[in-house]
From Swiss-Prot:
The chain crosses the membrane at residues 130-150, 173-193, 204-226, 233-255, 269-289, 307-327, 332-352, 366-386, 396-416. The gene is Slc10a5. The lineage of its organism: Eukaryota, Metazoa, Chordata, Craniata, Vertebrata. GO terms for cellular component: membrane. It holds the Pfam family NTCP5_P3_N. The keyword Nuclease does not apply. It comes from the Eukaryota. Residues 1-18 form the signal peptide. GO terms for molecular function: symporter activity. This is Sodium/bile acid cotransporter 5. One of its GO terms (biological process) is sodium ion transport.
Length: 434
């Protein structure tokens, strides 16, 4: 009886020993997806298998797509443990790799263990990448664009109405709606949609951080072009940027834990403060010009529309140039979420403002401020918090949202102007000539 029981135990143990994994990656933490950026990469595979004869085991690397990966050589190092160093030449794309451990005894070879269908993604960090190398722009062109931006913000300062500021101070409902949507509703929607679409953790975190960004300069620019309340838009942008110093670290901590991402997340305080100063200083100059030199303020107000349109197209061009390398990594789900994020911000802002019976220009402004996000603050958080290549993968989100929101707003502007044209021509025909 005891002999039969001992044999039964051996039968239980033997299959377990046969299924023991002898291979493991030594220099890679995330084995679900290997991400490479350089033209040549090395991976180290450790084998815990004890050779029956000296140097009888070897590693075979099988590549699914040789256009993405090519094996240069495999080097075996046997000291206390056995390591195989696989030298690979990489090309942009995705493929699968299978690693097999074989043992050779004379003419007979035996498969000992294998790591099947390990997913590999290769992408390049070219000069198009904002993070690795800036776009090469002539210094004179750079100074011209910078001067245009400062002049444009100064002109916006000339359009600030103190009566509107007093009204908002007494009834801050539009600002409160913007805060609730930007820092509570939008991050939750970003998290929920990223889970529904099954995005990787890094990309999901990128979208959540993009959704928790404050309003950007595009909000008050489009408030002007779409006949919203410019003063309210500027006030909402400054308020949300100030609150971002508190709300962005809170949301990054909360949602990173929900996504199962550990580590310290850094908030770019200097970048947020500099963004706020970059808005306030030239606009304060515009306010002073309006009160001290009204005639010059009128001239500045005349150029604000053409200047804003010019800067809008320059911004779209630069965003596409910088984001091109990231868009190569974007799939259908990422593009879909990139389109949904600004659209949801516009929808939530306009709908809630309408529910509270706010005037039409105010409804437009709340929608624009919650739909046009300063995505590049999310990019700064990602780059400070993650190591490459995870940071590169997460950076797809803010760039996709930035480009999709620019295209959506441009389309909205064209539709709005096309609808306005017939009504303007009708009003002109009805106007008496005398």
């Amino acid at each position: 009886m005891s002999g039969n029981f001992f044999i039964f135990l051996l039968l239980l143990v033997t299959p377990g020993e046969a299924k023991k994994s002898f291979l493991s990656f030594l220099n890679i933490q995330n084995t679900e997806m290997l991400s490479f950026t350089r033209t040549e990469e090395n991976i180290v595979v450790r084998s815990s298998y004890k050779d029956k004869q000296p140097h009888s085991s070897y590693l075979l690397v099988k590549l699914e797509d040789p256009k993405v990966l090519q094996v240069v050589n495999v080097t075996k190092t046997s000291l206390a443990v056995t390591d195989f160093t696989v030298n690979l030449k990489t090309f942009p794309g995705e493929t699968n790799v299978t690693l097999q451990l074989w043992e050779s005894e004379g003419r007979q070879t035996t498969l000992i263990d294998e790591l099947k269908n390990v997913r590999v993604r290769v992408f390049r960090q070219t000069d198009d990448s904002l993070l690795q190398a800036p776009i090469h722009v002539d210094s004179s062109i750079f100074l011209l664009v910078l001067s245009m931006i400062l002049l444009n913000k100064c002109a916006f300062g000339c359009k600030i109405e103190f009566q509107v500021l007093q009204t908002v101070w007494k009834r801050p409902l539009p600002i409160l709606l913007g805060v609730v949507i930007q820092f509570f509703l939008m991050p939750f929607c970003g998290f929920l949609l990223s889970q529904i679409l099954g995005l990787p953790k890094a990309q999901a975190f990128g979208f959540v951080m993009t959704c928790t960004c404050p309003g950007g300069g595009g909000g008050y620019l489009f408030a002007l072009l779409l006949e919203g309340d410019v003063t309210l838009a500027i006030l909402m942008t400054c308020t949300s940027t100030s609150l971002a110093l508190i709300m962005m670290p809170v949301n990054s901590y909360f949602y990173s834990r929900l996504l199962g991402l550990a580590g310290a997340f850094h908030v770019p305080v200097l970048k947020i403060v500099s963004t706020l100063l970059f808005i306030l200083m030239p606009m304060s100059t515009g306010v002073i010009i309006k009160h001290k030199m009204p005639a010059k303020a009128i001239c500045l107000e005349r150029v604000v529309r053409p200047l804003s349109l010019t800067l809008m197209f320059v911004g779209i061009y630069l965003a596409f140039r910088m984001g091109l390398v990231f868009l190569r990594m974007a799939n259908l789900e990422v593009f879909l979420l990139g389109l949904l994020v600004p659209a949801l911000g516009l929808l939530f802002g306009y709908s809630l403002a309408k529910v509270y019976l706010l005037p039409l220009p105010v409804c437009k402004t709340v929608a624009l401020e919650t739909g046009m996000l300063n995505s590049f603050l999310a990019l700064a958080i990602i780059q400070l918090s993650f190591s490459q290549p995870k940071a590169h993968e997460a950076s797809v989100a803010p760039f996709t949202v930035a480009m999709c929101s620019s295209c959506e707003m441009l389309l909205l502007l064209l539709v709005y102007k096309a609808k306005r044209r017939p009504s303007l021509s009708t009003e002109y025909e009805k106007t008496p000539l005398v």
